Design a protein with these regions (language model features):
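Membrane-embedded alpha-helical segments and adjacent helix-loop junctions characteristic
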Residues: 2-87, 246-309
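Short alpha-helical transmembrane interface motifs in multi-pass membrane proteins
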Residues: 24, 98-103, 134, 171-174, ...
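Transmembrane helix-loop junctions in multipass membrane proteins, especially transporters and channels
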Residues: 33, 37, 70-74, 120, ...
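Membrane-spanning helices that line or support transport/gating and their immediate boundary helices
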Residues: 39, 43, 105, 109-112, ...
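Juxtamembrane and boundary regions of transmembrane helices in multi-pass small-molecule transporters
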Residues: 109-171, 181, 285
Length: 309
């Protein structure tokens, strides 16, 4: 019973994180199929120069994360679009993901709206803005060094191949209905974030709105995903639900774009969720058996001074 209770309590503690991961999976699929991400990619490729893309991505994610106080929301929304822009401009996934995550977590650490920042200052009984000021001693130099690295990497990137970017833009136009109306979805999401609506509610409403826009602007794609020969609301709804929970692969004449618009929905988050559940089960068993306390006590004996800590 003790083991069962400890494991149950651990899993209950990460239930919110698991729900957020599932909604992020659904959001990433719906934002792609609805045309929101393709629209952001289409306009982003025309605005952001490849030489400064990585540094710009880091700064954009940092600013949004500071304003929202949520690195997860930043990565799940604007991060997806920036990943698409970077891949279209020929950058490797690792560089793009590094720029997105670096900016998002920097903003999260110094944002007065961040739950982790507020929690840390509360636990240590430190005024919030004093805590942020001390955090900036390490985070700001880290960000500056990171921006220098991303700038050098961006300037070293071959930005002369504009034909490739033009081909991706043309393929996007052929596959999706690109329209400024689709920008309403990220704008509404930004408003919800600014009004401090909880992350789960924000992501859910953003997914729901993108689903409505998918039915309006991308019915042909939903029909293709559903695999149903006869067009109708049932087939469109089936295509929408398949995008939410499973993998979707749409064929285009551009190999880069075909890979770019492939989504995995909620199913893409299952490996991470299984890992979290296994870790919680292991941690619960270690706690209930007393082994975790025994191991911790050994380390505590040596933590007598600041240097040893």
């Amino acid at each position: 019973k003790d083991y069962e209770l400890a494991i149950t309590n651990n899993i209950a503690g990460v239930a919110t994180a698991i729900i957020i991961l599932l909604i992020i999976g659904a959001l990433s699929g719906i934002w792609m199929i609805s045309g929101v991400v393709p629209t952001l990619i289409y306009y982003g490729m025309q605005i952001i120069h490849p030489s400064f893309f990585l540094a710009s991505t880091c700064i954009i994610c940092a600013l949004i994360s500071v304003m929202t106080g949520s690195s997860w929301t930043t990565i799940a929304t604007i991060g997806i679009a920036l990943m698409g822009i970077g891949k279209a401009q020929g950058f490797e996934d690792g560089w793009i993901a590094g720029a997105i995550i670096s900016g998002a977590y920097f903003g999260d650490k110094i944002s007065p709206l961040s739950e982790t920042t507020i929690l840390a200052s509360s636990i240590t009984d430190t005024p919030l803005f004093r805590h942020i000021r001390y955090m900036m001693i390490t985070t700001v130099p880290s960000l500056i060094i990171t921006l220098i690295i991303f700038t050098v990497a961006g300037l070293s990137h071959d930005a002369s191949n504009t034909q490739h970017i033009a081909e991706v833009a043309t393929a996007l136009n052929e596959k999706f209905h690109i329209t400024p109306w689709l920008l309403i979805v990220p704008v509404v999401t930004g408003i919800l974030i600014a009004r401090k609506v909880p992350s789960i509610v924000t992501l859910f409403l953003s997914t729901l709105l993108a689903g409505v826009f998918a039915l309006i602007f991308q019915p042909e794609l939903l029909q293709e995903i559903s695999g149903v020969a006869v067009s109708g609301f049932d087939s469109l709804f089936k295509g929408l639900m398949m995008t939410v929970y499973g993998a979707t692969n749409l064929h285009t004449d551009n190999a880069v774009l075909t890979d770019l618009i492939a989504t995995r929905g909620m199913a893409g988050m299952m490996n991470t969720i299984w890992l979290i559940l296994c870790a919680m089960c292991f941690g619960g068993a270690m706690t209930a058996s007393g082994m975790l306390g025994s191991i911790t006590s050994i380390f505590v004996r040596f933590m007598k001074k600041t240097v040893s800590v």
